[in-house]
Amino acid sequence: MHTYKSGCIFNTLSDIKDRHIVVMGLGLNGGGEACVRFFLKHGAYVLATDMKTAEQLKPTIDRLASDPELNTSKLTYRLGEHCIEDFKNADCVIKNPGVKIEGNKYLSAAKNIETDISIFLHFTKAPVIAVTGSKGKSSTVSAIHYGLNSAGYTAFLGGNITVSPLTFLEKTTEKTPVVLELSSWQLADLRGRGSLKPKISIITKIVPDHQNWYHAMEPYVADKQYG
């Protein structure tokens, strides 16, 4: 199991300005796109890299290109391949949770590795409700989020439920609860950082899952227990 060093490369949001960031995994589901938007907004130079081609990623690329609020002069792409020099030269690599760090030559070359979840947890002051498990995560976080908003709170919902918490980081305060659905992979990417300190932790039913990745229940359960 990989353990990350504690803390975050960025002490403040202003530290992001003019840093060179590699977003590994632009994708089509919004997570990589949210990372690109966040780091461009804070003045970083961003290289988005993905094994998918520009044609395959056209919807995401078009959304970024057509947003007048983004300074896309600081955005470059490397698509259809990864280049190890990009990872060596970056100040920080933003890792997709679906990429294994063990045995990955690109991530091994990186000076610093973060995720959207690790960045969010480092900077938010919001109380966090963290939910993991094999079955029932999404319905559980959705119910909690609905209940909090119905009770008069301004609550946010993100994580594995396909909403990156970076999209609402700067709207959070000590009074805005955040409900995070966290997969085993997202939890593994937090090991050693010391940033996950939820007010409430919930683990739903655990059953064999993702065994093509873990090859045994013990490491899978160990990642879930981290939550």
Predicted segments with their positions:
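Phosphate-binding loop of NTP-binding sites
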Residues: 85-90, 97, 101-227
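N-terminal leader/targeting and accessory segments in enzymes
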Residues: 1-115
